[in-house]
Design a protein with these regions (language model features):
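Short, amphipathic alpha-helical "recognition" segments used to contact nucleic acids or chromatin
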Residues: 1-18
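DNA major-groove recognition helices of helix-turn-helix
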Residues: 40-41
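Short alpha-helical "recognition helix" segments of helix-turn-helix
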Residues: 23-24
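Short Lys/Arg-enriched helix C-cap and helix-to-coil transition segments
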Residues: 44-50
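Residues in the recognition helix of alpha-helical DNA-binding motifs
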Residues: 37
């Protein structure tokens, strides 16, 4: 499994998702995760990365 380092996080409550940009250590490939749901009541989030 690849190890990712988090470099930037963008939180968008209006659209209820968290956009995360990072890179894979092994191959230094640019990746972007946008499938993160936000719980409006608790302001917490859960990732649904594949």
């Amino acid at each position: 499994m690849s190890v990712y380092k988090l470099i930037e996080v963008y939180l968008d409550y209006r659209n209820n998702y968290l956009s995360v940009q990072g890179y894979a250590d092994k191959n230094e490939l640019s990746v972007e995760f946008t499938e993160v749901l936000i719980d409006e009541a608790t302001r917490t989030y859960k990732s649904i990365y594949g």
